[in-house]
Amino acid sequence: MEAIKLPKKYRDICEEIKNGSSESLAKLDAFEEKFPHQNLAVKAGVEFFERQYEEAVSHTLLLMPFWDEWYYSNVANEYMMAMCFAAKKIGREAEVIPALHEEQSRLMEAEEEKCLKGSCQRYNYCKILLNYMLQNILPELRATDYQPPKAPKTASELIAEGKLNPEKDFDRMKLLNLLFMKGSPEDTVDYYERIKDLNLGELYYEQACICYGYLGQKDKVLEVIERWAKSKLWDVASPTQVRPMSFFMYPFMHEYLENEDSLKRIREAIFG
């Protein structure tokens, strides 16, 4: 199975949907025969962000044998994570668990050596998702591991240590990262607010969310997620990524993705 290259007309429709045009979903029907799996992915992405979990899970289950039609492995992982999250909400674990086992079997047949060596990313991620489905366990991530240092350093100290030029955008982002690792959460979010208009990468948004979460400022976490959604950093893997499916990969986001009020704000930020 080879990765599918989508024509410009299809990509343009995806862009319209990404920008909030629900009417453009119907335009995908013209491509149903040629790109049925890409159509499923687009529809499922929209459904996950409308909390239409029954439809989203059904569509993603149909996609499971066809992930190799995408160039990037993160597409499969993001959709599978979203599917598992939604399935737990609507009680469809009994369908999703065997689908994950079947995906592992397909991968083992196609890439046995890589699977046995632990170098097949999707095979490994299926293991993670099975633990999530069966035991409600996800790997410890930065958000749950985070503890500020006992003796946090100030921004001035970190600038001097790193010989940073706070007038340069690259150095300003580097300072934000250093504050997250070596400074206090208060200083980290204060500095994030000062530089948030830069073209920040996803790592920096995640760090700001983690620090605001640690400080118990849930409204500020949502504000960062909104800015992250508006950045469109999440859409680079494929035109079919019409919604930020990567958000489901961050457990700290789950409470915002399942709450209609916060999800509405995230959608509005996407359409921005």
For the regions a language model picked out, list residue spans one by one.
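Structural register within alpha-helical repeat arrays
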Residues: 12, 43, 79, 83, ...
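Alpha-helical protein-protein interaction modules
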Residues: 93, 97, 103-121, 136, ...
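N-terminal leader/linker segments that initiate helical-solenoid repeat arrays
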Residues: 1-22
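The tetratricopeptide repeat
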Residues: 8, 39, 75-79, 121-125, ...
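TPR-adjacent "capping" and linker segments in tetratricopeptide-repeat scaffold/adaptor proteins
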Residues: 1-7, 28-35, 162-168, 195-197
